[in-house]
Amino acid sequence: MAEFTHLVNERRSASNFLSGHPITKEDLNEMFELVALAPSAFNLQHTKYVTVLDQDVKEKLKQAANGQYKVVSSSAVLLVLGDKQAYQQAADIYEGLKVLGILNKQEYDHMVQDTVSFYENRGEQFKRDEAIRNASLSAMMFMLSAKEKGWDTCPMIGFDAEAVKRILNIDDQFEVVMMITIGKEKTESRRPRGYRKPVNEFVEYM
């Protein structure tokens, strides 16, 4: 418990990164193995990550992100995508429950149909909202996992989502939820932590 408290207290949004700290796919995959355990509605795992290590592509993303330098100084840039059609994978995702005998065929069929109907009956706005909700849960898990591995991150919303889609050839079924830069923070330029509301200002008991 003390370790988690320390992790949360140490995690900051890094505005400046040190150069010369490349990150490998192996480093990132260790984090993604933990991210895979993030909660998602109906276990649909709506989130996809497009991870950019190539410096030339990062330069293009910098332009789409209003010229923010941390995009190119970071070790990698992640685009967190939410799949608006994730419910269509319900049959594949639940297949294992049937194979293991946890669900019989009738229960499996009902579970798939109930999930699909839940989304289709609520329309396109709900599908988009769900993509954003679930991808945001996953993104927070990634940032904590990164910090636990000794890396610093910054979640970003200041970018042109349509430009990002064009640069990375992202299909319209995905919502670009946020951009995350990751690297080693240049701590000497870090500002003090911003004001945080006391608990009684954001929690209500009834």
UniProtKB/Swiss-Prot annotation:
It is found in: Cytoplasm. Gene3D superfamilies: NADH Oxidase. GO terms for biological process: catabolic process; response to toxic substance. Its cofactor is FMN. Homodimer. Putative nitroreductase that may contribute to the degradation of aromatic compounds. Belongs to the nitroreductase family. This is Putative NAD(P)H nitroreductase MhqN. It comes from Bacillus subtilis (strain 168). The gene is mhqN.
